[in-house]
Amino acid sequence: MRVGCFYDMDCCHRPTGVTRHALSQLERLARAPSIELSVITGRVRHPDGLAYWKALEGPARRELPLRTRDILRWWRLKPWPPIEWWSGPLDWVYCPAEFFVPTRNARRAVTSHDVLQALQFDPPRKRQLLRRIFDTADLILSVSHFNTEQLLDAYPTCRGRVAYVPNAAEDYFFEPAADHERAQVRANLGLPAQIPYLLSVAAFQPRKNLARLIRATARLREVTAGDLAVVLIGAGGEEEARVLREAAAAAGSRAIFCMPGYPPDLALRAIYAEATALVFPSLCEGFGIPAVEAMAQGIPVALADSTALPEIGGAAGWYHDPTDEDAITAAVRGLLDEPEERARRVALGRAIAEKYRWNVANELLVQALLNHR
């Protein structure tokens, strides 16, 4: 089966969950015996994207003459030329994100990551484009059952064209972090030696609810005393970062809030391993990859009780209303104060995380493409 995977390789810089999904599926499609893969991208400019693109071995590679964002903008205005002009004949064009890509004969598969986010936060023009993308797709790949429900509620004509293909955690998150990696974590983060910390892994976006997370954790006596740090892995726009810095400053001079940006992948594994817990009060999640990564590394998870997170965390989570600072504080307080229950849920979390491996997700993707030819 001839499959063309279309994605923007410049997104390799500070990869979000969507990009991690795209690259993980791409790399496994390249090894799938039933797939003849071509990888197609717009002009690659960022050094991180160029490094990935040049190192990609196995599949045929096609780089278009315009940046991905520019050619997608052109295709929105005029669905021509078809992507087969560059790729040659294809059975499927697979988009790991919500892209509109015109084809000559190939069927189109697009991935839906977070319909509710689009409905709640995107402007009307983008929502109209999403409807067009779903209306013209032959197959829609949905990353969670919650997202599928939202998709079919908003776009009922998609019924019969949706397949479940979840996100996952990379295999190395299921392996213990090396002792030397763990030993360097606090020094690399700029934390005092031996200090425990709560962890957040999320882009600095309003829907991730990080300012409320800071205010809620600042109510913990250990945090205000400087005996428990809070580490926010992520990055974002200057305005959102300013809001978070101001919220952290309001917690008092002894509180320790650390915002180190995005570390390399193996360093992130060690950061998870050393954390006391992951706190993830996101207002809107179509999946929630950090919850799986944390459970795979054997740390407890305090999760929002809404959108897809209860589906992903199952019985392993300490759940809270993400709009209520008192509820977030209480969930973390309970997690900290119940060592026996914490150990029980950590064991549950490891078992739950095993369901979310990329080889399983890739098998579901390949089967969906085969079933919908």
Provide a role label for each language-model segment.
Residues 1-373:
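Carbohydrate transferase catalytic cores enriched for Leloir-type hexosyltransferases
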